[in-house]
Regions:
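Non-heme di-metal
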Residues: 2-224
Length: 224
């Protein structure tokens, strides 16, 4: 299992590019760790879908709202509001629930509790209402989600499901969302810079650990 030393101490003139590069490296590593769906048991496939659903259905809108509350830039708020508008208007949680049920992977209490510690840490981080760090965390998550959708669809297919609305929509729309959130990050940093001792990647690292728990189960995350 690869680990990262997340370095927030970047030069101003290359800050945006450097941050996006670091995020791309982290996402590439997470995608590279994904198991082959064909080598997984039905229960392992079900568990990944169930843990993903247990986290995403009730938390994504909450997390994006937390970022909206945290930011100071008036230019950033419409970017986050547009993301939330799409989530609510198009009922993305309904899409996810349909996808999960069709794959016979509706989360159990055990599924939810298996990621509870990592999920709680992300929630507590967002409760600090730090604009820059919150936006970066959501940019990272959108970047990972759009890369993860093909794998998630393959898991569902192996479970006998043909339901694809959720994975098809997010495999496309989250590309735009990622780009917009990185633009929002630069706008927020211009008016609400973080302090010299702040960890820019605090939320990213916590969310990375949650993703590992979703994909590999909580035992795997102890070594991450």
């Amino acid at each position: 299992m690869s680990t990262f030393t997340l370095d927030p101490r970047l030069h101003d003139e290359t800050l945006g590019v450097s941050i996006q590069h670091q995020i791309a490296v982290i996402v590439d590593d997470l995608i590279g760790q994904l198991p082959d769906p064909a080598r997984l048991t039905a229960e392992q496939r079900r568990g990944i879908i169930a843990r993903y659903s247990a986290v995403l259905e009730g938390n994504f809108i909450y997390w994006m709202t937390a970022a909206y509350i945290a930011v100071k830039s008036e230019e950033v708020r419409p970017i986050l509001a547009e993301n939330l508008f799409e989530e609510i208007r198009d009922a993305h949680p309904v899409m996810l629930r349909k996808f999960t049920i069709a794959a016979h992977a509706f989360p159990s209490e055990n599924d939810a509790m298996s990621v509870d510690r990592e999920l709680t840490e992300v929630r507590l981080f967002l409760g600090k209402v730090q604009g820059v760090q919150s936006v970066l965390t959501m940019a990272f998550f959108e970047c990972w989600i759009q890369r993860f959708m093909g794998f998630l669809a393959d898991l569902a297919s192996a479970q006998g499901s043909a339901e694809r609305e959720y994975t098809d929509v997010h495999g496309v729309c989250d590309i735009t969302h990622t780009a917009e959130l990185f633009r929002a990050l630069q706008l927020e940093m211009a008016v609400n810079p973080i302090g010299p001792d702040a960890n820019l990647f605090e939320g990213v690292d916590l969310l990375r650990k949650l993703i590992i728990a979703i994909v590999h189960g909580p035992a795997e995350n102890t070594a991450a």
